Amino acid sequence: LDRLSVPDGFEISYYVDYSHAPRSMVFGDNGALFVGTRSPTTRLVYAYVDMDGDNVAETEYIIDSDLESPNGVAFLNGDLYVVTTTSVLRYDNIEDRLDNPPEPIIVYDNLPDNPQHGWRYASFGDDNRLYIAVGAPCNICEYNPDEFGLILSMTADGDDVQIEGRGVRNSVGFDFHPETQDLWFTDNGRDWVSDDLPPDELNRISDTDLNFGFPYCHGGFLVDIDFPQDNACEGTQAPVYGFP
């Protein structure tokens, strides 16, 4: 931790220092920290609880095991949602059952089965819809734009699936603006072009079915070298910020 810098007035410390390949996390209503993992060998979802209020979690629970990249975790109305490569699972009243977790309810089981960029990030919006990142199945390729490279949303019951954004290579995190509820998300740019290009992106979704360019346009300005198209960036959403 001594290698990290924080702004004045902030401090950083360990909450859990023994977690197993954590990748995404969410707090429950009663303070349990749920952690999803990406590793093909870990395949677990954990919960950590600070029992004495000292801002250090002392107790670890295994919520489920032998799952397919259970990366995405989200929480709504007392229930934990876990998003694997292909499915959305729900664990009801989970904070009351940490030491004996229930069998999950399959909410949705039609996410595309492809391991590359197959770890899903997920979060609930203020509209109580579950938002899920579905990455492209490659470093750079053409693919079915209705199946891959998407930000999806659905109801908490897995119904009314909608495409919120297209042309997204690999988002590894997103959140909602507390006032506008616009969805802000990262997108990792393609490899094997140069050290600095194309940029990784910070993007914003303020309307449905927006196109963020991949695989033909990167960063709002750069036409792809493997799949060049005339006017490739026309009609696409430029990032709010490009990371070199």
Where are the predicted features?
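A short helix->beta-strand "capping" segment at the edge of beta-propeller domains
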Residues: 1-20, 58-60, 243
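Beta-rich, blade/repeat-based domains predominating
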Residues: 18-30, 65-79, 83, 112-130, ...
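Short, solvent-exposed loop/turn segments at conserved positions within beta-propeller repeat blades
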Residues: 39-44, 83-84, 99-100, 139-149, ...
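Short loop/turn segments immediately following beta-strands, especially the blade-tip
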Residues: 48-54, 91-99, 205-212
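Asp-box/WD-like beta-propeller blade repeats and closely related beta-sheet repeat scaffolds
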Residues: 58-60, 65, 69-70, 74-76, ...
